[in-house]
C-alpha cells in the first residue's frame, strides 16, 4: 500500500523524536556513570538501550514498507553468522544499505552491537547519529593523515568488546551513482585498472588498516553483495515512509581472516579482486538474471520491532492524552505555539534524516582522494 509520505512524517517524526531523545538521554546517563568504571557493562547496557531506537527503523523496513530480502548463503556461513565477530564488506548501491545491514544484524541477535566506519558528519545527525556515537561507531574525516590514528584507536577499543559484533565497512567510500561510476571508469583508464560497470573502485587503505589491526580477534570477513531485485523500485527512506515495498537480493560469503595475505599490498589487492568479482556477478545478474549459485533463504520479519513500536506508541498516546488534559486547563497561545513548534521540529528532524540518506547528497567521487586511498 502506497500512501503520501507526508501523512506519516508527523506521527512517526513525533514518535521517533520523543523516543530518540529518551534513548539518547539514557545513553548519556550510563556513559557518564557506568562507562568510566566498566566499559564492558556500559556496552551491554547500551546494546539494549540503542535497540529501543533502532528497532523502530527495522519496523519501518519490515512491517510498514514490507521490504523482502532474499538471502543467498551457504549452510556453514548461515550457521556461524551472529556467533562470531566479523568485518562486513559490502558494495554500496542504495540509500538504505546501512539499514539492510541492521535488519540482518537484528535477525541474528547483534543489532545493538553492530558497528560501522562512517563519515564524521553522521555523528551530528539528530537522534540517530548521537546514538551511534554512544555505541562506539568509528567516524572519519576522509583525510588519511587524520583518519589513520582514528582507525587504529577505534579498532583497539574493540579488542575487549564483550558481545558478538559486526563491523561494517563500505570501501567504495560513497554510494553508487552513474556520475560516480563515470568518474571511477575515467580513473581506471588513467591507472590501467579494470573498468568497473556496477561497482566503484574500492579505497583500500582503510580496509588494509582494519585487517591488520583486528585480524587477531576477528575471525571472519562477511563478503556481501547486494542489489535490488530486477524490476523492483530502489528502496529509499522516503519510499519506505510511503509504504512502498521492494525486494533485495543479498549474497553473503564468509572468508577466514587467517587466509588473507599478510602484506599490506596483498590485502589491498585481495580487496580489489573481490570487487572485480562483485562487478562480474552484478553484470551477470543484470544481463542474464542469474544472481548467485548459493541456496536462497527467505528472511522472515520478526515480531520484536512491532512490539517495541507498539509500546512506544502507547507511551506517546498516553503522554499526549495527559498533555491535552493539561492544555485544556492552562491553554494559552504561548502553550499552543510551543506545541506547534515541537511538531515542526519533529518534521524537520525526519526531513534531515531522509535527506542525509539520499545518494544525490552523498560525497561525490573525487579522483585525488581516491588516489590517496587506493594502493598503487
Swiss-Prot record:
* InterPro entries the UniProt entry points to: Acyltransf_C, Plipid/glycerol_acylTrfase
Protein name in the entry: 1-acyl-sn-glycerol-3-phosphate acyltransferase 3
According to Swiss-Prot or TrEMBL, what is its membrane topology? Multi-pass membrane protein
Q: In which pathway does it act?
A: Phospholipid metabolism; CDP-diacylglycerol biosynthesis; CDP-diacylglycerol from sn-glycerol 3-phosphate: step 2/3
Known function? Converts lysophosphatidic acid (LPA) into phosphatidic acid by incorporating acyl moiety at the 2 position. Has preference for C-18-CoA substrates compared to C-16-CoA substrates.
For the biological process aspect of GO, one term held by this record is: CDP-diacylglycerol biosynthetic process
Metal-binding recorded as keyword: no
List the SUPFAM superfamilies: Glycerol-3-phosphate (1)-acyltransferase
Q: Report, as the record phrases it, the tissue specificity of this protein.
A: Predominantly expressed in pollen.
Transmembrane region(s):
14-34, 49-69, 98-118, 306-326, 335-355
Amino acid at each position: 500500500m502506497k500512501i503520501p509520505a507526508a501523512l506519516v512524517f508527523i506521527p512517526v517524526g513525533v514518535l521517533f523524536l520523543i523516543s530518540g531523545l529518551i534513548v539518547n538521554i539514557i545513553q548519556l546517563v550510563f556513559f557518564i556513570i557506568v562507562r568510566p568504571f566498566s566499559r564492558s557493562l556500559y556496552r551491554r547496557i547500551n546494546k539494549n538501550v540503542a535497540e529501543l531506537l533502532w528497532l523502530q527503523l527495522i519496523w519501518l523496513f519490515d512491517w510498514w514498507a514490507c521490504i523482502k530480502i532474499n538471502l543467498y548463503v551457504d549452510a556453514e556461513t548461515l550457521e556461524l553468522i551472529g556467533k562470531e565477530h566479523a568485518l562486513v564488506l559490502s558494495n554500496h548501491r542504495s540509500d538504505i544499505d546501512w539499514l539492510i545491514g541492521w535488519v540482518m544484524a537484528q535477525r541474528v541477535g547483534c543489532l545493538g552491537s553492530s558497528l560501522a566506519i562512517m563519515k564524521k558528519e553522521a555523528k551530528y545527525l539528530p537522534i540517530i547519529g548521537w546514538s551511534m556515537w554512544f555505541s562506539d561507531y568509528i567516524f572519519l574525516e576522509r583525510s588519511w593523515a587524520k583518519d589513520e590514528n582514528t582507525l587504529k584507536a577505534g579498532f583497539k577499543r574493540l579488542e575487549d568488546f564483550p558481545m558478538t559484533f559486526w563491523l561494517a565497512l563500505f570501501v567504495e567510500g560513497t554510494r553508487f551513482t552513474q556520475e560516480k561510476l563515470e568518474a571511477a571508469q575515467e580513473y581506471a583508464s588513467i591507472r590501467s585498472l579494470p573498468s568497473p560497470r556496477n561497482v566503484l573502485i574500492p579505497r583500500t587503505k582503510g580496509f588494509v588498516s582494519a585487517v591488520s589491526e583486528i585480524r587477531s580477534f576477528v575471525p571472519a570477513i562477511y563478503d556481501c553483495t547486494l542489489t535490488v531485485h530486477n524490476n523492483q523500485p530502489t528502496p529509499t527512506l522516503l519510499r519506505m515512509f510511503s509504504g512502498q515495498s521492494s525486494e533485495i537480493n543479498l549474497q553473503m560469503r564468509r572468508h577466514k581472516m587467517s587466509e588473507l595475505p599478510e602484506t599490506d599490498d596483498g590485502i589491498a589487492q585481495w580487496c580489489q579482486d573481490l570487487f572485480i568479482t562483485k562487478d562480474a556477478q552484478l553484470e551477470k545478474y543484470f544481463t542474464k538474471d542469474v544472481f548467485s549459485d548459493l541456496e536462497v533463504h527467505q528472511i522472515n520479519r520478526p515480531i520484536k520491532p512491532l512490539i517495541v513500536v507498539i509500546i512506544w506508541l502507547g507511551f506517546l498516546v498516553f503522554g499526549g492524552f495527559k498533555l491535552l488534559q493539561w492544555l485544556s486547563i492552562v491553554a494559552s497561545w504561548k502553550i499552543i505555539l510551543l506545541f506547534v513548534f515541537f511538531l515542526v521540529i519533529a518534521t524537520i528532524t525526519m526531513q534531515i534524516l531522509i535527506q542525509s540518506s539520499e545518494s544525490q547528497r552523498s560525497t561525490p567521487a573525487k579522483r585525488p582522494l581516491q588516489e590517496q586511498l587506493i594502493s598503487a
